[in-house]
C-alpha cells in the first residue's frame, strides 16, 4: 500500500497526542477543493457543500482549502468560511495524447514524490485546526484523506466522477487500487449518482457508500411553444470534447436531414470549435449547426430551444440535464452513466444508446413530428427538476456527516 509503513509510523507519533477531535461549539470541518475557480460542476458542488454546512450548522467552524486563489475561494468567503491555500497534488492525470502509454514508465516516480509534501502540509494543518471531520471533493486529491487517516480524523470522500471512463484519467496507483484506497481512507464515500456508486462498489464491495444528488436551482422556465412550421431547435451545453458528445449530436442532425427532417442544433461550451465546424461542413449540416463559446448565463439559449440534449458517453450526473429541464425543456439523452437516473423515457425525455446517432435522430424526429408529446415531456421535465432542491441536499449531507 502507498507509503503504508511510513504512514503507520507517523500515525503512532502524531495522533493528536491521543486526544479526540474537538466537540461542542468549537467543532471544525475542513473541506478540500481540487480547483480554485469555477468552470465545471465540481466547483459548484463544492460551493453547495460549503453553503450546506453554514446553513445547517452556523456554529460550525468551516475551513475551505484550495490549491490557489481564485473566484471559487472569493465566492465562498461570503458564507463565513475561512480560506486556506495549500498544496493539493493529484494522483490522477489526463493522458498525454501523443504517448498515452508512457505514464506508467515515466510518471509514477515523480508523481509519487510530489504527493509527500501535500500529505505533510495537510498533517500540520490538521494538527493546528483539530477538525471534527474532513471532506475531500472529487477522487483526484488524496493528501488530506491520507493525513486524516494518519491522525484518526473521520474523513468523507465526495466522488463526483467515474474518473477513468468519463475523463480518461490515468491513475498513479492504478484505477482499481485507487478506488480501494478511497474506501479505506474514508468513513463514507458520498457519490453524486447511483451509477457512480455502483462503479465504486464493483471494484470494492466493502466500500461504505451513499448517494446525494447535487443541488440544481437555476431559473425555472415555461415550456416554450413551437409554432406550426417552425423548425425544432435543440441545444447541447458542455465542454467541447469527444466524451461530451457534440460529434454525436451533429451526426444525429445529419441523419435527420437525410431522412428529410431539418433540426437546428445549438452547441454552447468551452474548447475548440474548429473540429465541430469541420464535421458539420463535411456532413452537409453547417447551416443547421450554431456554435457558441461559454457563458455564465444560459437563460437566453434555453429560451430559444425546444429540446435539450445530453450526449455524453458516460456522465456521472449531468447538471446541465437538470438545468435544461428547469428551463422547461424535455431532454434527449444517452442511456449510460447517471443520465437514466434523471431522464425517464417517455416521462420527461427520451433515451437512446450511447454513440447511437440514428437512435438519437429518431427520438428527435419523434418530437419534431409530435408537438403534444414534446409538450407533455416538457411538463414532466419541470416536475422532475424539483427533486434537486437545496433543502433535500443539505439535510441529507448533514445527516451523513453526523452533524445534525
Model region roles, listed by residue range:
Residues 40-51, 232, 236-255, 322, ...:
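A conserved mid-protein helix/loop that constitutes part of the nucleotide-sugar donor-binding site
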Residues 57-61, 234, 246, 250-290, ...:
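A conserved nucleotide-sugar
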Residues 64-71, 216, 237, 241, ...:
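Glycosyltransferase donor-sugar binding loop
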Residues 117-118, 143, 154, 163-185:
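Nucleotide-sugar donor phosphate/pyrophosphate-binding loop at the beta->alpha transition
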Residues 195, 215:
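Carbohydrate-associated surface elements
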Residues 294, 313:
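Aromatic "clamp/platform" in nucleotide-sugar-dependent glycosyltransferases that forms part
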Residues 330-333, 343:
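Short hydrophobic beta-strand element within catalytic cores of glycosyltransferases
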Residues 345-346, 350-357, 366-371, 386:
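Conserved acidic donor-binding segment of nucleotide-sugar-dependent glycosyltransferases
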Amino acid at each position: 500500500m502507498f507509503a503504508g509503513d511510513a504512514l503507520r509510523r507517523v500515525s503512532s507519533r502524531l495522533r493528536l497526542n491521543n486526544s479526540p477531535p474537538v466537540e461542542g461549539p468549537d467543532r471544525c470541518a475542513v473541506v478540500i477543493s481540487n480547483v480554485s475557480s469555477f468552470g465545471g460542476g465540481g466547483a459548484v458542488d463544492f460551493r453547495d457543500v460549503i453553503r450546506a454546512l453554514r446553513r445547517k450548522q452556523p456554529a460550525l467552524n468551516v475551513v475551505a482549502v484550495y490549491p490557489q486563489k481564485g473566484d471559487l475561494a472569493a465566492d465562498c468567503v461570503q458564507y463565513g468560511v475561512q480560506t486556506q491555500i495549500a498544496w493539493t497534488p493529484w494522483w490522477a492525470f489526463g493522458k498525454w495524447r501523443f504517448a498515452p502509454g508512457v505514464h506508467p514508465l515515466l510518471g509514477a516516480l515523480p508523481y509519487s514524490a510530489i504527493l509527500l509534501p501535500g500529505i505533510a502540509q495537510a498533517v500540520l494543518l490538521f494538527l493546528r485546526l483539530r477538525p471534527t471531520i474532513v471532506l475531500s471533493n472529487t477522487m483526484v486529491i488524496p493528501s488530506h484523506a491520507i493525513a486524516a487517516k494518519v491522525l484518526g480524523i473521520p474523513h468523507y470522500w465526495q466522488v463526483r466522477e467515474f474518473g477513468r471512463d468519463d475523463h480518461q484519467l490515468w491513475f498513479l496507483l492504478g484505477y482499481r487500487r485507487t478506488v480501494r484506497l478511497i474506501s479505506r481512507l474514508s468513513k463514507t464515500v458520498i457519490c453524486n449518482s447511483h451509477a457512480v456508486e455502483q462503479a465504486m462498489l464493483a471494484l470494492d464491495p466493502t466500500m461504505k457508500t451513499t448517494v446525494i444528488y447535487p443541488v440544481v436551482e437555476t431559473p425555472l422556465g415555461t415550456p416554450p411553444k413551437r409554432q406550426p412550421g417552425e423548425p425544432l431547435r435543440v441545444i447541447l451545453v458542455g465542454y467541447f470534447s469527444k466524451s461530451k458528445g457534440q460529434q454525436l449530436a451533429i451526426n444525429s442532425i445529419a441523419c435527420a436531414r437525410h431522412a428529410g427532417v431539418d433540426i437546428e442544433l445549438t452547441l454552447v461550451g468551452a474548447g475548440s470549435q474548429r473540429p465541430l465546424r469541420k464535421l458539420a461542413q463535411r456532413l452537409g449540416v453547417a447551416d443547421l449547426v450554431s456554435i457558441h463559446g461559454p457563458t455564465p448565463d444560459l437563460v437566453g439559449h434555453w429560451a430559444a430551444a425546444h429540446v435539450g440534449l445530453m450526449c455524453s458517453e458516460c456522465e456521472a450526473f449531468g447538471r446541465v440535464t437538470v438545468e435544461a429541464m428547469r428551463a422547461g425543456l424535455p431532454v434527449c439523452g444517452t442511456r449510460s452513466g447517471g443520465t437514466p437516473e434523471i431522464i425517464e423515457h417517455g416521462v420527461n425525455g427520451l433515451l437512446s444508446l450511447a454513440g447511437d446517432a440514428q437512435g438519437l435522430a429518431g427520438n428527435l424526429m419523434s418530437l419534431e413530428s409530435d408537438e403534444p408529446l414534446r409538450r407533455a415531456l416538457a411538463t414532466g421535465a419541470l416536475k422532475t427538476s424539483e427533486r434537486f432542491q437545496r433543502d433535500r441536499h443539505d439535510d441529507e449531507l448533514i445527516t451523513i456527516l453526523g452533524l445534525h
